């Protein structure tokens, strides 16, 4: 018999110490990694529930195991909420991650060796959009497209490449692009050659749900997303679609199970259901609106201080600082800001002279700081502190002073009150 009072702290002090140190780090550091966010205690309650004990291969009403009547209800809630939130008529909530959701779409729509157009990783794309080190670049013939001199997607070049290479699928979406994607134009280009348009909206799903960013569902054949990032749920993936036939939906389901995964993580699916319900609340819309406002406020400060922002601004939750002219590498900036308790990630910029392990830029996102209560004033103040550190990157006194300011602000605006 298992006793409910069993806990990690009394049993595994080494592990518990590391876990508690991470809790402290999250509370005492300002999180600016665009793909990270803080999920609600309700979501964590679902993830820590007894649903973790249940195996449920298959789909609601069509399981390979008995005893699934209640987890069927859980998964159906998640499916129905995902469809309602994004205006889809199909949803698969089982992918363990965004990458696995993307893998399922590839295998459902393509054959190995088929040609795909995907955004260049160095221009803001994602590993699963055709990077040679990823399955997408190894199994498929990927032709990269990119951004123009102004940091915007070059749709004319994309259209020309589509005509030249005749891909079977065009991928929209990004991991480091600060503009608004013209989904309708991308569908038009795909239609001109009879290709699928597949959109990975992982980074902007929360903004889309709140109506702050254009919804790709009416334009794409298939859409995937993660459930963390701007959506602020558990780590996991979704596949969404609208207007396809049942045959295609069955292919997508089969590509997830049994094609790519075995049993779904029912405790995570329950957490997805909670997060999707939270995303339907008016408070969530206000949160996403503030995410965008905070990003613009930070960009304004960086521009005023003479820093180069790729594309000159932001229309979503993130932006890239190009540090080439400053003769600072992304790795150096990441480390210096980290010493001041400000967490960012180094990121390649267009035409980056440095390797992906060093880079010449940093990516900055506002979902996490907004989640802990930052408004424009705090965002501008934070951007100013970051400029102080980057202007004096080897000055330990500046970094130490900034760290004290960060600690005070974190104490005033905790993640979990």
Swiss-Prot record:
<feature type="site" description="Plays an important role in substrate specificity">
    <location>
        <position position="228"/>
    </location>
</feature>
<comment type="similarity">
    <text>Belongs to the SHMT family.</text>
</comment>
<keyword id="KW-0808">Transferase</keyword>
<dbReference type="InterPro" id="IPR015424">
    <property type="entry name" value="PyrdxlP-dep_Trfase"/>
</dbReference>
<dbReference type="InterPro" id="IPR019798">
    <property type="entry name" value="Ser_HO-MeTrfase_PLP_BS"/>
</dbReference>
<dbReference type="InterPro" id="IPR049943">
    <property type="entry name" value="Ser_HO-MeTrfase-like"/>
</dbReference>
<keyword id="KW-0554">One-carbon metabolism</keyword>
<dbReference type="GO" id="GO:0030170">
    <property type="term" value="F:pyridoxal phosphate binding"/>
</dbReference>
<comment type="pathway">
    <text>One-carbon metabolism; tetrahydrofolate interconversion.</text>
</comment>
<keyword id="KW-0028">Amino-acid biosynthesis</keyword>
<protein>
    <recommendedName>
        <fullName>Serine hydroxymethyltransferase</fullName>
        <ecNumber>2.1.2.1</ecNumber>
    </recommendedName>
</protein>
<feature type="binding site">
    <location>
        <begin position="125"/>
        <end position="127"/>
    </location>
    <ligand>
        <name>(6S)-5,6,7,8-tetrahydrofolate</name>
    </ligand>
</feature>
<dbReference type="GO" id="GO:0004372">
    <property type="term" value="F:glycine hydroxymethyltransferase activity"/>
</dbReference>
<dbReference type="InterPro" id="IPR015421">
    <property type="entry name" value="PyrdxlP-dep_Trfase_major"/>
</dbReference>
<dbReference type="GO" id="GO:0035999">
    <property type="term" value="P:tetrahydrofolate interconversion"/>
</dbReference>
<comment type="pathway">
    <text>Amino-acid biosynthesis; glycine biosynthesis; glycine from L-serine: step 1/1.</text>
</comment>
<dbReference type="GO" id="GO:0005829">
    <property type="term" value="C:cytosol"/>
</dbReference>
<keyword id="KW-0963">Cytoplasm</keyword>
<dbReference type="Pfam" id="PF00464">
    <property type="entry name" value="SHMT"/>
</dbReference>
<feature type="modified residue" description="N6-(pyridoxal phosphate)lysine">
    <location>
        <position position="229"/>
    </location>
</feature>
<keyword id="KW-0663">Pyridoxal phosphate</keyword>
<feature type="binding site">
    <location>
        <position position="121"/>
    </location>
    <ligand>
        <name>(6S)-5,6,7,8-tetrahydrofolate</name>
    </ligand>
</feature>
<comment type="function">
    <text>Catalyzes the reversible interconversion of serine and glycine with tetrahydrofolate (THF) serving as the one-carbon carrier. This reaction serves as the major source of one-carbon groups required for the biosynthesis of purines, thymidylate, methionine, and other important biomolecules. Also exhibits THF-independent aldolase activity toward beta-hydroxyamino acids, producing glycine and aldehydes, via a retro-aldol mechanism.</text>
</comment>
<comment type="subunit">
    <text>Homodimer.</text>
</comment>
<dbReference type="InterPro" id="IPR001085">
    <property type="entry name" value="Ser_HO-MeTrfase"/>
</dbReference>
<dbReference type="InterPro" id="IPR015422">
    <property type="entry name" value="PyrdxlP-dep_Trfase_small"/>
</dbReference>
<dbReference type="InterPro" id="IPR039429">
    <property type="entry name" value="SHMT-like_dom"/>
</dbReference>
<dbReference type="GO" id="GO:0019264">
    <property type="term" value="P:glycine biosynthetic process from serine"/>
</dbReference>
<feature type="binding site">
    <location>
        <begin position="355"/>
        <end position="357"/>
    </location>
    <ligand>
        <name>(6S)-5,6,7,8-tetrahydrofolate</name>
    </ligand>
</feature>
């Amino acid at each position: 018999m298992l006793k409910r009072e069993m806990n990690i702290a009394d049993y595994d002090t080494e592990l518990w110490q590391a876990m508690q140190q991470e809790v402290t780090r999250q509370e005492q550091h300002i999180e600016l990694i665009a793909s990270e966010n803080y999920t609600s205690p309700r979501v964590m309650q679902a993830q820590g529930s007894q649903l973790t004990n249940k195996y449920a291969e298959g789909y609601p009403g069509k399981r390979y195991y008995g005893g699934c009547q209640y987890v069927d209800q859980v998964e159906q809630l998640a499916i129905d909420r995902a469809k309602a939130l994004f205006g889809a008529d199909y949803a698969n909530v089982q992918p363990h991650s965004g990458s696995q959701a993307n893998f399922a779409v590839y295998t459902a729509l393509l054959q190995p060796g088929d040609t795909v157009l995907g955004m260049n990783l160095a221009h803001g794309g994602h590993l699963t959009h055709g990077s040679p080190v990823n399955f997408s670049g190894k199994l498929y013939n990927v032709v990269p497209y990119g951004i123009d001199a102004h940091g915007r997607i070059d749709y004319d070049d994309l259209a020309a490449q589509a005509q030249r290479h005749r891909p079977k699928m065009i991928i929209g979406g990004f991991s480091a692009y600060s503009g608004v994607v013209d989904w309708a134009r991308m569908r038009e280009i795909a239609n001109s050659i009879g290709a699928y348009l597949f959109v990975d909206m992982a980074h902007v799903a929360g903004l889309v749900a709140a109506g702050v960013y254009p919804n790709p569902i009416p334009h794409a054949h298939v859409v995937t997303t993660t459930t963390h990032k701007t959506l602020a749920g558990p780590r996991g993936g979704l596949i969404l679609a609208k207007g396809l036939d049942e045959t295609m939906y069955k292919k997508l389901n089969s590509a997830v199970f049994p094609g790519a995964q075995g049993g779904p993580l029912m405790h995570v699916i329950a957490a997805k259901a909670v997060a999707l319900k939270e995303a339907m609340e008016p408070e969530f819309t206000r949160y996403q609106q503030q995410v965008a406002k905070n990003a613009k406020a930070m960009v304004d400060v960086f521009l005023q201080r003479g820093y180069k922002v790729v594309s000159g601004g932001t229309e979503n939750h993130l932006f890239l600082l190009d540090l080439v002219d400053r003769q600072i590498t992304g790795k150096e900036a990441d480390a210096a800001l980290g010493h001041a308790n400000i967490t960012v990630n180094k990121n390649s910029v267009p035409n980056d002279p440095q390797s992906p392990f060093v880079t010449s830029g940093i990516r900055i996102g506002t979902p996490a700081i907004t989640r802990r209560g930052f408004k424009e004033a705090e965002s501008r103040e934070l951007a100013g502190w970051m400029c102080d550190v980057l202007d004096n990157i080897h000055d330990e006194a500046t970094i130490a002073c900034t760290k004290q300011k960060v600690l005070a602000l974190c104490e005033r605006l905790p993640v979990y009150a």
